[in-house]
């Protein structure tokens, strides 16, 4: 967020996670909502509540765009920061995603008879909530991976220190004999 083309003073940030919130505050961002309590064990209900709040702000014109920033889980060692625009959806964003992920093998399976507007009114909230929930889960997985890596490193360091201390103890004991 701090490296993007954003006016940090104009952002309404709904922060999930203490470290991210603290870093954004240090960078001069205004935190509109602190949701740090949901980051440990995120639930779909938490994502739905946050999604509804964000959508209400968007629908009332309080915000012009909605972006989701989160840590993407690649594996236990690698985590990548991601920033994606959720709303408004642009044709360029869709084309880029289709190009990146491919559309081979996709075929039309049904025709919609409902009005486009009513379909979008139903789908956009579900899309928003699922993207927020996915971001929460990926961030939680990334944090757990980082914790596992840190514990593994600490265990290795402790074992190495124990070997060194055992060697020193044995040398001192041999010297005393």
Language-model features: locations:
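C-terminal beta-strand-loop-alpha-helix "lid" module of Rossmann-like NAD(P)-dependent dehydrogenases
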Residues: 1-177
